Amino acid sequence: TAGDANIKINTAIGSITLPGNMLPEELTGAKTVSMSIALADKSKLSQELQQRIGDRPVIELNLKVDGKSYSWSNDDVPVTVAIPYTPTEEELRSPEHITVWYIDSKGNIIEVPSGRYDPETSSVIFSITHFSQFAVVYVTKAFDDLDTVPWDRKAIEVLASKGIIRGKTETEYAPQTDISRAEFLYSLVRALGVTAS
């Protein structure tokens, strides 16, 4: 059916795979639907955010319906984005720390847990359920108390870097501490990319 078909848009800035059912039924009668992917103006970001992102790309995704901006969001229909990216030598030593941030309208950052570097396509790939600004970032989170679990150190730090799990503080993970059901559910929801709806 038409809802099962995907549309892939390729540009020099990136590619987007759009599910055929991404738009709500109320837009069925629209005459034109246009989508844009563009490099965002980093100078509009805070100095701190500009420093944290560095030379990495920041993209902006927009949708217009019949020439008017449309705020698309659909938790049930993720869109896949791929941004061409060449990691630095440091990043190539730990490419699992290459990830993506969603930058909201107030300049706040929200981790996109699905963000990852794909060496086969030399791109950063991630799935989203709304359009906005997204930045490729390299995040390393380290905890000072992981010596008792050396076999888990890398996994814990990568998951924390992607926002899937959280430490007790910025430098303490507390690996021997029991987790609550709520903490487990938070991590599971973030890892799977599911929503409450």
Model-derived segments and spans:
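Surface-exposed loop/edge segments in extracytoplasmic proteins
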Residues: 107-114
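C-terminal beta-strand-rich structural cap/linker in extracellular carbohydrate-active enzymes
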Residues: 124-140
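Secondary-structure transition/turn motif
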Residues: 12-13, 115, 127-132
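Short domain-boundary/entry signatures in modular proteins, especially
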Residues: 56-57, 136-144
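Generic recognition of long tandem-repeat/solenoid scaffolds
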Residues: 61, 67-72, 121-129, 173
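Proteolytic processing hotspots in large secreted/extracellular or virion-associated proteins
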Residues: 1-106
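Glycine-rich adenosyl-nucleotide cofactor-binding module
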Residues: 118-122, 151-154
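Extracytoplasmic Gram-positive cell-surface binding/anchoring modules and repeats
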Residues: 140-195
